[in-house]
Amino acid sequence: MLKLYHCAETRSMRSLWLLNELQIPFELIDMPFDLSVMRSADYLAVHPLGRVPCLVDGDFRLFESGAIAEYLCERYPESDLGRLAANPERYEWLQWIHYSETMAVHAASLVQQRFFIAAADRSAVVAKLEGRRLEKAVQVLEPRLIDRDYLLRSGFSAADIGVGYSLHLADRLIELARFPNVARYLERLRARPAFRASLPQGSTHAISWLPLSEPIK
C-alpha cells in the first residue's frame, strides 16, 4: 500500500489531495509541524532534508510534490488526472505542474518574512518584493481562466491540484479578489470533496497554521 508523509496544509497537501482524487487505498503518516520530529534521525532516513511530502511505494521512495504527481498519474492513468506522453496537452500539463512551484516559492518566502523569521531579521524590502512577485505569478492565471473552468481545455487535472494549493496559500497573503477569474477558480477547487478531505479535521478554507495578515499594499 502507498504511504504518504504529510504535514497539514503544507506542500504535501498537493499529494494528499491527489491521492484523495484517485480514490485509492493509502496510509497517511500525519507529521507534526515540529522540527524536532521532522529533523529526527528516524525521519531523515525517510526524507534526507526532513521535509514533506514523501511518498513510499513498497521499496520505492519519492519526494517533491511535482514528481509525486507525475508518478501517481502515470501509475494510475485511468484517473485522467495526468496527461500522458501521447496526449496533445502533455506539455501544457507539465508546464502548470511546475508553475505551481514558481508560485509557492514566492508565497513561502513571504510567509518566512512575515511570520517565521525573527522580527529583527525581517526585511520589509524582501517582503514587498516577494509579495509583488506572487501577485504577478497569480496574474498570469487570470486571462487563462477567462473561458474555462480549469487550466486545461479538457478539464480538471493534477495541474489544478498543484496550482490550487499554491492559491490556497496565496489567499492568506495577497488580495485574490483583484483577480476575479482566479478567485472563482479557487472556489471551484475548494468545493471538490477531495480538497475538503485533505484539510485538517475541523479546518475551514483558511490555512490553520498561518495567521491572517494584511495584504501587500
PLM region spans:
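GST-like domain detector, emphasizing the conserved glutathione-binding G-site
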Residues: M1-V125
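Residue-level signal for nonpolar/aromatic packing positions in well-ordered secondary structure
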Residues: L19, L55, I68, L141, ...
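Conserved beta-strand edge residues that scaffold enzyme active sites
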Residues: F33-D34, A159, S203
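Active-site-flanking alpha-helical
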Residues: C73, S166-L167, L199
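Short, flexible loop/turn segments with low-complexity composition
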Residues: L84-A85, A197-H205
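GST-like fold's C-terminal all-alpha helical module
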Residues: S100-A191
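Acidic/histidine-enriched, glycine/proline-rich intrinsically disordered or flexible terminal extensions
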Residues: G202-K217
